[in-house]
Amino acid sequence: MPKTSDTEYLSFPILLGDIGGTNARFSILIDSFAEPVHLTTVKTAEYPGIDDAIQQAVLDKTSLQPVSTILAIAGPIEGDEIPLTNCHWVVKPKDMLAKLGLKDVIVINDFEAQALAIAALDDDNREPIGSGKKDMLASRVVLGPGTGLGVAGLVYARHMWFPVPGEGGHIDIGPRSARDYVVFPHIETIEGRVAGEQILCGRGLVNLYRAICKADGIEPVFSDPADITSQGLSGQNAQAKETLSLFSTYLGRVAGDLALIFMAKGGVYLAGGISQKIIPALKSPEFRAAFEDKAPHSALMRTIPTFVVTHPQAALSGLATYARTPADFGLALDGRRWRA
């Protein structure tokens, strides 16, 4: 892909939006030298649509009127009407151009934005898990347990970073250890298989906890991922503690598989709130042991660093990084950019 031409640069100010199923976060980037200014975070359920949220929560409350916008959304981007996953909003870029005074609208995948973020993430915004030394221009991977399991790669070629989104959250996870073979029969399946998102997300954390309880012959007492996490970290509940241990193991296995696929000597990054909350569990031996247990390539795996992304607004940071210097990225915009 050729470098971005001057005609593809966006005009400032640029509204940046990280649109999730529950929350929508907005920042504004005044120029290419500025840091993004966080404007607001809104609950998607409180607004009938994204245009209403932008108008009422952003435009009506700031004198900085954006000319362009880049939105990162959870869901496939196809056509001129883009429904969001786990949310009633539908993004209609042509309507945004007509109603909100914008001249340029770009819509990308939420984990493309996470991939853009890890291109320039500094030490203050990541927590190392285990050892390993990063190769600055080598491929990288980001995965994030959240509402689902997001996955993206970041590949350097032709003097540019190329984000590579996908549906890696739906890869198979299978049993390996003796304990796995006891627990896995009780994990909820999708058409007979256990996919990544059946375990490695908030809902999956609950699925795993319930499976452990069934394997132990006891009734589950928790139904909220936050309760399982807090009880597991404190060690006050044996099943919750094992849930975090197995969750870390399975996350390590999947992260290791993705590292091999991308030859991610630039590092594997764990994004999202769940990863941030369970850092103590991830620093226990299980995660790195599972990550490195990839014979015949265990020696290679020991050299690949792993991090938890601790930036509070990583997706917005990634969008800002791209907006400042789009020529540094091979971001495909066919069918994902609308202009007035």
Swiss-Prot record:
Its EC number is 2.7.1.2. It catalyses: D-glucose + ATP = D-glucose 6-phosphate + ADP + H(+). It is found in: Cytoplasm. One of its GO terms (cellular component) is cytosol. The keyword Cytoplasm applies. Disulfide bonds: none annotated. One of its GO terms (biological process) is glycolytic process. Belongs to the bacterial glucokinase family. InterPro entries: ATPase_NBD (IPR043129), Bacterial_glucokinase (IPR050201), Glucokinase (IPR003836). GO terms for molecular function: ATP binding; D-glucose binding; glucokinase activity. Keywords: ATP-binding, Cytoplasm, Glycolysis, Kinase, Nucleotide-binding, Transferase. ATP binds at residues 17-22. This is Glucokinase. HAMAP family: Glucokinase (MF_00524). It holds the Pfam family Glucokinase.
